[in-house]
Amino acid sequence: TEVYKALLRDYEPENIGIYGYSAGGLLTAQSIAWFQKEKLPLPGAVAMSCGAAHFWMDGFSGSIQAAINDFDLSLFGVRGTEYFRSLADLKNPLAFPGFDSTIMANFPPSLLITSTQDFSLSSVVRTHSQLVTLGVEADLHVWEGVDHSFLCNACLPESREASAAIVSFFDKHLK
């Protein structure tokens, strides 16, 4: 919040964009929820990649990706869920903003990026659907056949395409 407040001293909020990847996607959503709670002006746009406003292991994709990729679901599944519940209520909208439609209805224009082999696919799609239903401008891009970390490899054409989509989205929405 302090960094955002510092940015607001030098920039109009409509000139600020926030981007987060993986856990940073959730942090981006949490930031928007927190800014609303603190009555701060919202940024002009946000982009959330491979993480969004819902718990990443909710839905079909977390379970199926664990099976396909021989992923130890216990790291993020039942034990992981219990661990996160010990830290915060998973239905707390400051932890997972998707549980509060009022917060979600006030999101700035949002870009959501994921892939078909991303364990957080369901969370990202659910966030996008919720935003659209609530009347928030939201774009969803899904890349075929790459995993959760595809954006980390700049050699992949999909990574370059996703990066271009992010730049284009911010160019469109930030003044």
Mark where each language-model region is:
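Alpha/beta-hydrolase superfamily serine-hydrolase fold, recognizing
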Residues: 1-175
